[in-house]
Every structure is written in C-alpha cells, then in structure tokens.
Amino acid sequence: MPIHPSTTPPPDLYVAVNGINTRYWQMGDRGSKLVLLHGGNGSIEFWLYNIAVLARHHQVYAFDMVGSGKSDYPDGSYSLGYQAEFLHSLMSALAIDSATLIGNSMGGGVALVFTRLYPDRVDKLVLVDSMGLGREISMGIRLITLPAIVNLLRPGRWMIPAMLKSNFYHSQQLPPEWIEFRYPIFAIPGRNKVILRLGQSNFNLAGVRAEVYQPIVDSLAQITQKTLIIWGEYDRIIPVKHAYTAAEGLPNYQLEIFPNCGHHPYLECPAKFNRLVLGFLTA
C-alpha cells in the first residue's frame, strides 16, 4: 500500500463563514484555483498526500466542511444542499470567484449539487468515489442513522482502524501515522451528535435518500464542465458501478478506474492520483 507522508501539514487557517468558524489550508500562489472537498466525517488531513504536489502548479484550498474536522458544528441539517450553499459562502469569503472542485465521497456529492446551483463558479470537476449517483452505500454508513448505534462510538485510537478498515483495499496496512493524524478529530467532544445528524440528513437504512441522489442523477446531462471521474475498483463504501452511472449521464467526462484501490484512491495511490489530476487540469 503506497501510502506515505510526503509533506508536513500546512498551517491551520480559520475564516468565519455565516458565523461558523471554518478551518482551511491554502497552498500555492500561481495557476488556477482548486477546492478540495473531503468525505463525510472526514477532515482536511485526508488531502495531506496531495495538496503540496497540486500546489506546485495551482492555488489549492482545502477546508473542514461544516460539521467536520475542526470547523464548528452548528445545529441543523447537514444535507448536500446545505453544504453546497455553505461552500458558496466560503468561496465568496475567500475571494474564490471560480475553481475546479475535487470531491471525494460526500464531498463529490456536494460538488455535484454546487455545480448544478452555481455552474459559473465551477471550472472543472474531479469526482473521486463520489456520493450522489445512486442509492447503494455501505451498511456501516446506513447504520449511522440509528442513535443506538452512534451512541456506541467511543473516541479511542483503537477505533480508528476499525472504522476505516473497509475504506481501503489494503486495509491491513493502514499506516500508524494516519491514526495519529485522525485521532484528534475523533476525540473532539460532541462528534457523535454530528455524525448522527449527518447520517440522518442524507441516508436511511435503505441507503442514500432518494431525495438526495435522484436530483443529482437527473441533472447530470446539464453539467457541461470537463469532469474527471476516478474510482477505486474495490470500493466497499460506494460501488464502482456508480462511476459508470456518472459516465452515462455526463456529456464531457474522463473515466479512470484504479485497480487494487478502495474508497480513497488519492490515499492508496497518491502519486498516480496526483499525476492524473495534474494532467487533467492542463489538458
């Protein structure tokens, strides 16, 4: 499993967005602007092996999405629509007129909703094992809609490998340093309440809510931006068939399936991912 730290984390920066204190990283001072959107219950640390490489040629922003990481945890819905509107406010606060959106999992779903709402703010799209392209999602995600299950979660280091195991193809090789990156996020007080709210806003026991994914699928043909679809062949969170759903609906796409990868190709195969994205951005 070729995960290895390639950089130290950039300094944490904060910006108030609609009264919500939001953590972000920014690297790079030339080229076009990129916004990196992590998945549900993730954080900007997920992009640690990509941001410095991308920033050699681009101005790159990554932020803890509302209710995630070290950003504030407001009350209310965490639907894709709400998160897309929050992204719009964040980009305005940081003077990002338009950008390429690179979204993994729920971040991909947010990118798709945002592109439908604000097409003039999106230059290109990179969808990485994206949510929002069908009902199917892992049972573990469906179970976080149940209070009794979420209340069992405890912020111990031992839980991190157990929770992330199904995300990776080479699950037995999760690096120890990755546990150290993630543990402070898991240990933040009040996380369980947010996990439940995030789950119930977007999922039920059958999978992704129809009112969440169906409008996205129905509007794919209207997305004219060049779109790079990247998927891990052995994704156990969101099945690879959703990559082909995206390809069938999008009029201007490039599809890349990563063999021997799971839900996070940018972590399991960072060098390949970085080369592919940089090539797509310059094409």
Model-derived features: positions:
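Flexible "cap/lid" loop of the alpha/beta hydrolase fold
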Residues: 116, 124-156
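Alpha/beta-hydrolase fold catalytic core
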Residues: 1-34, 56-58, 96-97, 278-283
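Active-site loop/oxyanion-hole signature of alpha/beta-hydrolase fold enzymes
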Residues: 17-18, 25, 48, 61-106, ...
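Acidic catalytic loop of the alpha/beta-hydrolase fold
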Residues: 234-238
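Catalytic active-site module of serine/aspartate enzymes centered on a nucleophile-bearing elbow/loop
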Residues: 253-283
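Short beta-strand/loop motif that positions the catalytic acidic residue
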Residues: 223, 229-231
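Conserved alpha/beta-hydrolase catalytic His-Asp/Glu region
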Residues: 22, 156-219
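Conserved HGGG/HGGXW glycine-rich cap/lid loop of the alpha/beta-hydrolase fold
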Residues: 20-70
